[in-house]
């Protein structure tokens, strides 16, 4: 069984022309050329990482300070974010977890959730499965208080009085998750219970690739793990990458911009770096 649960963690919670023919490495990239009057930058994040693995590549803070604005996948500085998220996490049909799972699966997941998260699943009423995944994912990181690159960049941007914007909205992100069938979402919940050790190992492997700044290998691993997800790779990665390009182009033509998005979106033939290359921009790794 592929570790779909871990892929959801990596993707949501939250190349120069010469270099494209080589192994792509580096989390920080410079965007230039194609008539731009000033460079912009794109940084590949991982949404949750243990403090002892957290690092900021040399030059990242300097480039963020040089930029005039900061873009994340979504605007994490939106004062309405928490309220919007809570609303979107609730099932529109009012169904609770026990209504969409068979009795044995519900019992197994309830016990796992209580033991590992320390909460009763009944606390959340008609919450979507993704809420339970979001809370359970803390366990897979292997540390009690994982750090977030998104929170780091929000803090740095505020310190530098930079405007913080989003490439998409929280509504856009949840709409992607809502395209998964109920059966798919239940299977992801049960993977948390039945594939705990394998999921933890997969996550460790991804963190290792991330700290090595090997975005191509990371993208390949994510793609392999998504086999069998019935079109969700296209929804979670490819379409979102395509949707971001016009927003990126519009902004880099006007201001030097620092973008921070999941590292899994950067590599590959359909990744953000390749798509920008195809538009005529020069992508240079600042590793």
Which residues does each predicted region cover?
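Short, glycine/serine-rich, charged loops/turns that create anion-binding
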Residues: 12-13, 47, 264-265
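Bacterial Sec-dependent N-terminal signal peptides
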Residues: 1-24, 29
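A cross-kingdom marker for long, charged
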Residues: 231-287
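Structured, acidic catalytic/metal-binding patches in enzyme active sites
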Residues: 28-41, 46-232
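Short, glycine/charged-enriched secondary-structure capping and boundary segments
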Residues: 20, 56-57, 85-86, 272-276
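A conditional alpha-helix N-cap/helix-loop micro-motif detector
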Residues: 21, 53, 146, 237-241
């Amino acid at each position: 069984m592929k570790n779909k649960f871990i892929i959801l963690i990596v993707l949501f919670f939250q190349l120069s022309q010469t270099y494209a023919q080589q192994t792509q490495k580096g989390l920080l990239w410079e965007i230039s050329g194609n008539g731009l009057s000033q460079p912009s930058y794109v940084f590949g994040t991982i949404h949750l990482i243990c403090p002892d693995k957290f690092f900021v590549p040399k030059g990242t803070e300097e480039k963020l300070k040089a930029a005039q604005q900061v873009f994340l996948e979504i605007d994490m500085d939106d004062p309405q974010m928490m309220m919007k998220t809570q609303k979107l996490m609730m099932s529109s049909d009012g169904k609770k977890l026990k209504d969409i799972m068979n009795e044995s699966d519900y019992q197994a997941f309830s016990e796992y959730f209580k033991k590992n998260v320390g909460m009763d699943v009944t606390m959340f009423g008609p919450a979507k499965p993704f809420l339970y995944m979001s809370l359970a994912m803390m366990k897979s990181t292997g540390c009690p208080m994982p750090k977030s690159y998104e929170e780091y960049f929000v803090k740095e941007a505020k310190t530098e009085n930079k405007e913080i914007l989003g490439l998409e909205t929280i509504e856009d992100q949840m709409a992607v998750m809502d395209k998964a069938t109920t059966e798919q979402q239940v299977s992801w919940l049960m993977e948390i219970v039945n594939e705990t050790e394998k999921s933890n190992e997969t996550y460790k492997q991804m963190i290792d690739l991330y700290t090595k700044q090997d975005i191509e290998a990371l993208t390949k691993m994510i793609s392999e793990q998504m086999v069998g997800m019935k079109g969700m790779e296209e929804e979670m990665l490819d379409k979102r990458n395509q949707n971001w390009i016009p927003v990126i182009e519009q902004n880099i033509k006007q201001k030097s911009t620092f973008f921070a998005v999941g590292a899994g979106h950067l590599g590959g033939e359909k990744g953000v770096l390749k798509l920008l290359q195809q538009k005529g921009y020069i992508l240079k790794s600042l590793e």
